Amino acid sequence: MAVGYASGKVILFGEHAVVYGRPAIAVPVTQVQAQAQVEDAERGQGITIVARDLKQTYKLSEAPPDDALRAIVVSTLERIRIGLEQDLTLTVSSTIPVARGLGSGAAVSTAIVRALLEHFDKWLDSRAISDLVFETEKIHHGTPSGIDNTVIAFEKPVYFVKGERMEIFWVQRPFLLVIADTGVQSPTKVAVGDVRRAWEREPVRYEELFDDIGTIAEMGRRAIEQGDIEAMGRLMNENQRLLRLLKVSSPELERLIGAARQGGALGTKLSGAGRGGNMIALVTQETCSRVSMMLRLAGARDVIVTEVS
């Protein structure tokens, strides 16, 4: 049996604006993972996909072309020049909440690629894996930025500009993030589509907002590289203010953001598409427990603490 794993991710700075060519920063979250297992099956069975979390089992040959799991299997086998006439069982599971901004779709696809590579004793570098997953991300998100597949495939903090070479950068001083789940699903495709339509109606205003968010991402990278945690917090708060102006926050997010700030967080913002999903809080060792408690009291469905280093 071959097994592939992939971690989740959060965006620190730059969501939505990254779709329009501005920079964004994202980091892996190793506390949550997707897993894919590939096993040989009985002769003549073909390729069977078992999606445990969705409680679905189906044949690859019967899946529609826009099925994301089918798409990543087909594109991976084509990339490594293996025919589809295989007898395999692919089992997928994940601890990453769906539609919460943690990159669940990209992580599942990445885990599948890695499992298939191991099963067939093939190798692809992180860039090639990222490129394969990006094509599947179009099914999940419509017009993805490419940041999810990049940070998850490379498993490093990344500074990302769409269409340009991704940069892995140095974290001068490890920092703690508390990630809190609103419990509200927020499909990226919907929020990204709404922002695009608003941009089409008011291009000048939205380009200015995207510019401001891009500047924050640039300043955020400098703060991380210099180990200036306090500056990071201020920039996160400003990024959240701009995301409100993009109309991608929500009452559930604002409730958790307020609770985290009350608990002593240095900075707070939504992470991902918004309209639900997750928020992140920058904390110290001293404030981590209190912020986590405040978030739970405010109704967070789940709270994760991760160190970025």
Language model features: what each stretch is:
Residues 2-7, 11-13, 17-19, 26, ...:
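C-terminal nucleotide
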Residues 30:
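Gly/Ser-rich catalytic/binding loops embedded in alpha/beta enzyme cores
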Residues 77-98, 132:
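Glycine- and acidic-rich phosphate- and metal-coordinating loops
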Residues 102-122:
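DPxDG-like acidic metal-binding loop motif
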Residues 127-128:
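Short hydrophobic alpha-helices at membrane interfaces in multi-pass membrane enzymes
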Residues 276:
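Glycine-rich phosphate-binding loops that contact phosphosugars or nucleotide phosphates
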